[in-house]
Amino acid sequence: MANPDSVTVRKVETQADFKAFFEFPWKLYRDDPNWVPPLLSMRRHLLDKNENPSWEYLEGDYYVAWRAGEPVGTVAAFVNHRHNEFHNEHISWFGFFECIEDQYVATALLDTAAAWGRERGYNALRGPQSFTNMDECGLLVDGFARPVMLMPYNPPYYQRLVENAGLAKVMDTHSAMANWDILHEAGAVDRVNRIADRVKRSQSITVRGLERKNLKAEFELFKDIYNHAWEKNWGFTPFTSKELDALVKSLGSFIDPELACFGYV
């Protein structure tokens, strides 16, 4: 195992630093057939403190671990003030944790994130999370297959690195998957079809597709439904109006109105 003294964790302060942070996953996962790279534009928007509206209530820094002049890991240390207010907690977070299979590097990164929080008076570190619960969150510990959109993916060794660095599980979450054959075998498709038939026959339930000409109003309706439906879920924080505007901008151009439906009772 490498000498820990050869690992240096530095805050991202220059364009070159940011480039190393931004591009590191492509270096780490280049030989992993299950990794699905994010859209460059979406990752850039997510990390840009001037573009991502979530930074209205976030405070944080990015870090890169270096060895022999090469990046070997990344982490973001941040506080989500909106989460703390909504859940009456006093915690900081880590996210965008990516690391070679090296315990020294992982511990150095996570210790840096923990120290960042302690310096600001936060008594616990939680993660990984890509800023909010609406982004990728959680550490994959089982089912290392190609993920669907917005589901986290990481190498199996991450669990060992994180736990050996002193962190412990706070909550079990589940990653979604889309496999038509499994859904059929489980009878899920038949159940959905039966429910759909009952809805069609019902006089008290109506379903309509999204109206593209009123896109902003439709997304505002979605925000109200989403915030109400999820308000008691662990880790949830409500959408803000500016986050909704960003969602309209990112999804509005390619969303299929026939697949985005509203139900009324």
Which role does the model predict for each range below?
Residues 64, 70-79, 262-265:
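Conserved beta-strand in the GNAT
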Residues 117, 227, 252-255:
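Short regulatory alpha-helical segment in sensory/regulatory domains of signaling proteins that mediates
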Residues 2-50, 201-243:
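Short amphipathic alpha-helix that is part of the acyltransferase structural core
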Residues 3-7, 155-234, 259:
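Acyltransferase donor/substrate-recognition loop-hinge adjacent to the catalytic core
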Residues 46-51, 58-62, 78-80, 104, ...:
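Short alpha-helical segments and helix-capping/turn motifs at coil-helix boundaries
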Residues 48-64, 249-261:
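A short helix-loop-beta-strand connector motif used in the catalytic cores of GNAT acetyltransferases and
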Residues 68, 78-82, 97-99, 130-132, ...:
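An acidic- and aromatic-residue-enriched active-site/binding cleft used to recognize and process polar
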Residues 85-168:
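Acyl-donor binding region in acyl/amide transferases
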